From Swiss-Prot:
The gene is glyS. This is Glycine--tRNA ligase beta subunit. It is an enzyme of class 6 (ligase). It is found in: Cytoplasm. GO terms for biological process: arginyl-tRNA aminoacylation; glycyl-tRNA aminoacylation. It comes from Hahella chejuensis (strain KCTC 2396). HAMAP family: Gly_tRNA_synth_beta (MF_00255).
Length: 692
């Protein structure tokens, strides 16, 4: 079968930079999936993306689908011919439907008899006839929240489309895509080469754009070049560029022909907190900043221009003129904010509503302060610092700087608290209250920061659950999932042995009357269930998590200790047998409605040696496991209990539990209940059956 290269390019007005990679990858994936579904073989598929284009190059694409052997089954042989061997009407009708005659039909022998069949070869469709639909379907499936129309056209896309390339080998595919006639010409750089460029073959696409059109279509190549240029130009200052990956991705999406240039700003702006300077440079201007060897900010910025200027200094001067007033604004906000203390701004929070049913941001700050103090007392921190930090925690929201740059909340609070001569941990807690912001983010470094972060998150979770607005499906407007996971991470990774149930009670009391019923149970259950995704990501079997959840330990540190112990237990040779035995015991006790307890069986009622052995071994291992359980060394406790495997197996081999004598039967039930109780002190091992 012959093969050709295929190229599709969608030429548009500037595409959304933050969505460019996603659009390109989705477009390529859509084409890949549809080619595979159409059984069109190919050797390689590559995507290209630049501000004004999305393209996919498919190498070695088959010129047509493979031919198919088609088998159509007709009537049974006995119904196809009469006694004289002449075709029946059923046979003739089947032959006509297949476009043939009865003598061309074949026989198919099956377990259910012999049937007439018609076999034919269906020629594969030519690729050029299939590609337009494949491309259109792939475009229609792109993740575009809002599509737009342009001109008098009815077609829709993320941005107006001005040209289309559909090239198979050296031939243009005769079709319309998004209302435009496909061709083999593209456009180069908007300023360097606005004239059309003819693409002779798909393989020439990348080089033709680069060598003639001043366009680097390869996204990763462009991104690597920007990184290289930015790092090189920063060395001219004896400093180094800080390359934020998210910013680099966006800058690569904004430029077709990137050229890095360095500008300078006045040293006086370095008196402003670096985060504020970075925020305006990165957020508004898409600049990279420069630091010295100690990480201190230097008065330089690096911009990436989408043009190779004959007078680069003019471009630099223009950027310096743009950034100067923005930095001046930041300096003004900082100077103005310093004239008032954070404490004096607490009253400014009273008009700001946190949530209609939960009061103002002022109310929340007071609650957070009181809850943080209670938590601090439990974790051997300073309750006074925690309460002070909690009360001040939202005051920077009323500052000019944070109102202009909301992303600096907490960060500016830290600076302003330090300027106000607050204790260092109080200052640090202003920023650390928001940690962790996302999965994998750093945690608070101070105990005061931990206390305030926990208090802030718990106050929100309890409050929102308390007014019956928990997360539903994909909707989580208050970020409760992230907050709950943040609480668990702080408690587990910082080894803070707090009881969630107790903390939720405190938060509930500080909120006052809340309409939700069974609030404490609902919140604790919700938070413990966040562990599910945590352990899945860590590679811990879900059954291990469920075995611990069944016991519902409400201290996250202890919950984690139990999970890790059960995960180790699962590696033991005896694990599966013990899990099966626990399951069997659980079923027996459940069927007979026997309560699980530590009550000891009466040894005088034993009649079988196997039950006597189990009784003695259970007493011995319960005693040896008890100190480990009290010390929460659950790994060692389970290793002790694992030694019961042989006596448990022998018990079930030799002893009939459901005997006629009620006293003996009840005594054996009590023995099994105590066995079940011993394991349940760690986890419900019965849930681990066949999960090793």
């Amino acid at each position: 079968m012959n093969h050709q290269d295929f190229l599709v390019e969608i030429g548009a007005e500037e595409l959304p930079p933050k969505a460019l990679r996603q659009l390109a990858e989705a477009f390529a994936q859509g084409i890949r999936q549809r080619l595979e579904k159409a059984q069109l073989s190919f050797s390689e598929l590559t995507w290209y993306a630049a501000p004004r284009r999305l393209a996919v190059h498919v190498s070695g694409l088959a010129e047509k689908q493979p031919d198919l052997e088609v088998e159509k089954r007709g009537p049974a042989l006995q119904a196809a011919f009469d006694a004289a061997g002449a075709p029946t009407k059923a046979c003739e009708g089947f032959a006509r439907s297949c476009g043939t005659t009865p003598d061309k039909l074949e026989k198919l022998e099956t377990d259910k008899g012999v049937w007439l069949v018609f076999r034919s070869k269906q020629a594969g469709a030519p690729t050029t006839g299939l590609l337009p639909a494949i491309v259109e379907e792939s475009l229609a499936a792109l993740p575009i929240p809002k599509r737009m129309r342009w001109g008098a056209r009815r077609t829709e896309f993320v941005r107006p489309v001005h040209w289309i390339i559909m090239l198979f080998g050296e031939k243009v595919i005769d079709c319309e895509i998004l209302g435009l006639k496909a061709g083999n010409t593209t456009l180069g750089h908007r300023f360097h080469h606005p004239a059309p460029i003819e693409i002779a073959t798909p393989a020439n696409y990348k080089d033709a754009l680069k060598n003639t059109g001043y366009v680097m279509a390869d996204f990763e190549e462009r991104k690597a070049l920007i990184r290289q240029q930015v790092e090189a130009i920063a060395k001219q200052t004896s400093g180094m560029a800080v390359i934020d990956e998210e910013l680099l991705e966006e800058v690569a999406s904004l430029n077709e022909w990137p050229t890095a240039l360095m500008g300078r700003f006045e040293d006086r702006f370095l008196e402003v907190p670096a985060e504020a300077l970075i925020s305006t440079m990165k957020g508004n201007q898409k600049y990279f900043h420069v630091v010295d060897a100690e990480g201190r900010m230097l008065p330089y910025f690096i911009t990436v221009a989408n043009i190779e200027s004959k007078d680069p200094q003019q471009v630099i001067d223009g950027n310096e003129r743009v950034i100067r007033p923005r930095l001046s604004d930041a300096a003004f906000f900082f100077s103005t904010d310093k004239k008032r203390t954070l404490a004096s701004r607490l009253e400014d929070l009273k008009p700001i509503v946190f949530q209609q049913q939960l009061g103002t941001v002022y109310d929340k700050a007071i609650r957070v302060g009181k809850l943080a103090a209670k938590i601090a007392a439990k974790i051997d921190s300073n309750p006074e610092w925690a309460q002070r930090a909690g009360e001040l925690s939202k005051t920077d929201l009323a500052t000019e700087m944070v109102m202009e740059f909301p992303e600096l909340q907490g960060t500016m609070g830290r600076y302003y608290a330090a300027i106000d001569s607050e204790p260092e941990e109080v200052s640090m807690a202003q920023e650390e209250q928001y940690l962790p912001r996302f999965a994998g983010d750093q945690l608070p470094t101070t105990l005061t920061g931990c206390a305030v972060s926990l208090a802030d998150k718990l106050d929100t979770i309890v409050g929102i659950f308390g007014i019956n607005q928990p997360p539903t499906g994909a909707k989580d407007p208050f970020g409760l999932r992230r907050a709950a996971l943040g609480v668990l991470r702080i408690l587990v990774e910082k080894k803070l042995d707090l009881d969630l149930a107790e903390c939720v009670q405190w938060a509930q009391e500080l909120h006052g009357d809340l309409p939700a019923e069974n609030l404490e149970t609902a919140v604790v259950d919700y938070m413990l269930d966040r562990f599910r995704a945590w352990y899945e990501e860590a590679g811990v079997p879900t059954e291990v998590f469920l075995s611990v959840l069944a016991r519902r330990p409400t201290k996250p540190v202890e919950f984690d200790q139990r999970v890790l112990a059960v995960a180790e237990f699962l590696k033991l040779d005896a694990a599966q047998a013990l899990a099966a035995a626990n399951k069997r015991v659980s079923n027996i006790l459940s069927k007979e409605q026997v309560d699980i307890s530590a009550e000891s069986a009466n040894p005088e009622l034993f009649t079988e040696e196997a039950e006597k052995n189990l009784f003695r071994a259970l007493q011995e291992k319960s005693e040896s496991a008890r100190p480990y359980i009290e010390q929460r060394n659950f790994t060692q406790a389970l290793q002790q209990l694992a030694e019961l495997k042989d006596v448990i197996d022998l018990f079930f081999d030799k002893v009939m539990v459901m005997v006629d004598d009620p006293a003996i039967r009840s005594n054996r039930m009590t023995l099994l209940a105590s066995l079940r109780h011993v394991f349940l002190q760690v986890a419900d091992i019965s849930l681990l059956q066949n999960k090793a």
